[in-house]
Design a protein with these regions (language model features):
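Lipid interaction determinants
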Residues: 2-150
Length: 150
């Protein structure tokens, strides 16, 4: 593992986290739209080797009809699930995910920078302010550390 203060933060980060909530706020402090629907689910894994994997399923997803579903159902399934993997670096209170593979090809080779806060066994990731539907917003994702199975 890494040494020093950064090493201690990486040690706190390493593991698997389950998504607890996702919310957004406008630059005026108003509640924004639910970024992943009302009851999203997801997992986030950081390894000691500097790898990250993220999976987020929007709330309210419907099962496909039949074996593979209709074209419309497939499009909706794609729109409501995000998956990516790559490398991460930690610098101060920021974590950067460098995307190597993603369900959204446009994310590949992008850096996603998030402010990071630890609160007991919870991890808060906050996006930089971004223009969404004509309003500047930040998204806050709260993750709960999963304990190792006995």
């Amino acid at each position: 593992m890494a040494s020093g203060a950064v090493g201690q933060e990486i040690d706190k980060l390493v593991g698997t986290w389950k998504l607890v909530s996702a919310s957004s706020k406008t630059s005026k402090g108003e509640q924004g739209e639910a970024p992943y629907g009302l009851s999203p689910a997801g997992f986030l894994t950081y390894t000691a080797e500097g790898r990250v994997t993220a999976l987020i399923s929007y709330g309210g997803r419907k099962a496909l009809s039949g074996t593979g579903g209709t074209v419309e159902e497939q499009a909706e399934a794609f729109k409501t699930f995000l998956a990516y993997a790559g490398r991460y670096t930690l610098a101060g209170d920021k974590v950067t995910h460098t995307i190597e593979v993603s369900s959204i090809q446009n994310y590949v080779d992008r850096n996603l920078v998030r402010s990071i806060q630890f609160q007991d066994d919870r991890l808060l990731l906050i996006t930089p302010p971004t223009l969404v539907n004509g309003k500047i917003q930040t998204v806050e994702l709260i993750w709960q550390r999963l304990q190792a199975s006995a």
